[in-house]
Amino acid sequence: MKQDKVLQVCYEDQTVGTLAMTADHKVAFQYSDEWLETGFSINPFSLPLQKQVFVPVKDHFEGLFGVFEDSLPDHWGRLLLDRLLRAHKQNPDELTVLDRLAIVGTSGMGALTYHPEKNFPEEQSSADLDKLAEECQKILNTEYSDKLDELYLLGGTSGGARPKIMTTIDNEEWIIKFPAHVDGKDAGKMEYDYSCCAKACGIMMSETRLFPSEKCKGYFGTKRFDRRNCLKGKKKVHMLTTAAILELDFEQPSLDYHGLMKLTKIMTRNCDEDVENMFRRMCFNVFAHNRDDHSKNFTYLYEADEDKWHLSPAYDLTYSNTYYGEHTTSVDGNGRNPGRKELLAVGTGAGMKKTRCEEIIDEIEKKVKEMLEEYLLGK
């Protein structure tokens, strides 16, 4: 496979700018003149709308700025691509990050696209969900799967660690997850129950469903918030994870909810609704024992009509631990056993009224106990 050294980054029908590999294997970026006149900053922190060549300072993302790394698949998608390349007698270790972005092309998460695009599979078949789940397990257990091309097309550019596919249901774009080998077989039912509880707790969520299965209690699915139907057809929405905004290694604990609340205020220009929703997510994660609350699990969406950023719907909410036994994002400095005191400190520190914080804490603690008791008892 011929290596790419330069890529064009596009948004809808406009060229945002150019990515180019430097001699020291970092990927420089420069906005196009057209975008400087009519566009917006694709990362207000790292890439202000200025005429200059930007070069990453940090090395978390293989020489990329975080906003472009957000377009790349995480563990599952990367595993699929690497297996697919090997099946086609190609060495995945020879790919640069620009090659991987070119393979993502127009199919990545968010609104940014990369050109020239490298194409792989041409069409997807219609295997049922149980069959796809079986093929995912074969790959995770290092067995060969004869559905590599189909699985890559369905889910190879999605983020996250768990196997998943991206598909269209009733003209809407959805993500459907399958259990990983470390999950229980009913992980989908658990994540669905968590999503229902989160909605009851006033947390903004995309539509979720539990898709039927003959082999487990169902597969969890969620409507994509980076895709929307409009009068002109499908619209892609530009998105930024917190990891990308702050150029953080999401696999390392490096964030506190104080910082997340402050970031939400800055990104949304003090939108009270978004700030309160972030507070609700923190409370939910504490009471529902979601400790995998890393910096890629908090995202902001650019609303072009408003020329403004907003907090995205919540996602990846489920019972989870970390290998070090603490929240990935600490709560007022406490990652192991945060409680009411720390939650109040974060809320009031962000300018919320203490009485309002107490109301939300009580509301969410009660709802979580009512709706998620079966998952929390004895754990």
Language-model features: where?
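Phosphate/dinucleotide-binding and metal-coordinating scaffold of catalytic cores
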Residues: 1-295, 299-379
